[in-house]
UniProtKB/Swiss-Prot annotation:
Chain's role: Alpha-2 adrenergic receptors mediate the catecholamine-induced inhibition of adenylate cyclase through the action of G proteins.
Disulfide bond entries: C85-C163
Ranges of the Cytoplasmic topological domain: 39-49, 109-130, 193-370, 428-448
Lipidated residues (S-palmitoyl cysteine): C440
Site (Implicated in ligand binding): D92
RNA-binding keyword on record: no
Residue intervals passing through the bilayer: 13-38, 50-75, 86-108, 131-153, 169-192, 371-394, 404-427
Extracellular side: 1-12, 76-85, 154-168, 395-403
Protein name: Alpha-2B adrenergic receptor
Stated family: Belongs to the G-protein coupled receptor 1 family. Adrenergic receptor subfamily. ADRA2B sub-subfamily.
Recorded topology in the membrane: Multi-pass membrane protein
Known partners and oligomeric status: Interacts with RAB26. Interacts with PPP1R9B.
Amino acid sequence: MDHQEPYSVQATAAIAAVITFLILFTIFGNALVILAVLTSRSLPAPQNLFLVSLAAADILVATLIIPFSLANELLGYWYFWRTWCEVYLALDVLFCTSSIVHLCAISLDRYWAVSRALEYNSKRTPRRIKCIILTVWLIAAVISLPPLIYKGDQGPSPRGPQCKINQEAWYILASSIGSFFAPCLIMILVYLRIYLIAKRSHRRGPRAKGGPGEGESKESRPSPGGAPASAKVPPLASPLSSTGEANGHPKPTGEKEEGETSEDPGARTLPPSWAALPTSGQGQKKAVVLAPAEEEAEEEEEEEGDECEPQAAPGLPASMCSPSLQQPQGSRVLATLRGQVLLGRGVGAVDGQWWRRRTQMTREKRFTFVLAVVIGVFVLCWFPFFFTYSLGAICPQHCKVPHGLFQFFFWIGYCNSSLNPVIYTIFNQDFRRAFRRILCRQWTQTAW
């Protein structure tokens, strides 16, 4: 039988080149995600196993589905065995459904982590996450079985053998609801609930959260190291008021700033075991420990080990850049015109737990935001296809979209498999650092 190809030679070459790049990029990007989660110390959380499974599903789409879809698109007919057509259709539904059910499970995980933080985080073990992932794949497998069991009547085609999923209206609507619309509704409702919880928590403000460093100053007790157990942080002021040398006139000796008493009641008390560190210079206040090193995960520090240079901060005393006051590893410096406020690693067990908990909550918020972006992009990519697919089943005579537009929506859905690594790179600094470390290591090994 003479088959007429649907595209010209130039269009066929262009489409083949673009889709081949899509396949390679999808495999490379998602393999990088899996490698980053399994090898990086900054991505050890059990919930990241969801991302490993999701990346595996995207790799399977790129290797087992997209190449055959490309051949079917360019040839205009199904070139391969009939049995493989049935397996191909079932796998297509399986991987697409597993992706969205993964996102649905991730949404529920986010909700439980936000609404029942202490209770759920104690139960969120790798074993529990793996059981949830297995359940996700079983649900997707159940939804993908009908193409193997009931093939429907596809009828002859003038363009040769075709490989299409069941075209009956009941199956189209049932599969669209089960594979896309129902999970989407669950995700939207869950994330709406997460947003309301976060908004209510934000309204409460820091007073309701409590923790070290809040409340009135308590009597200092000596710590095991001999330093006072609590220290006061001087309130930050404007450059003019803080130096007492506005307009070039020094403040008279013994004159206090407005609102400042000898006991400095406005100063915040630091948690126990945070010792004060002296700075050089007569008139400078003591530098005090401000925050533990665990919080450095909240800041994006692209370069490490930078040394303090006097030229970089004109107007500051040179003593503040002396070797004795350089920032220790794992600490940060807040430099003001009053002096230098330096933090260190020495925190007590209770305070360390509080700060670790705060850092964990910050990462949870960032992770929730990144996954909201992932879900939003997934819905944007697949909604046009499922909407037009269902619309054709509801009113096939008057609502059917042109074939070219439908195929465009079909391929936009496949493109989603390559986007998650890009989203992680843009919105998550932990993944960004892990990707850079892996790629730089491979580049170094290749160079040598």
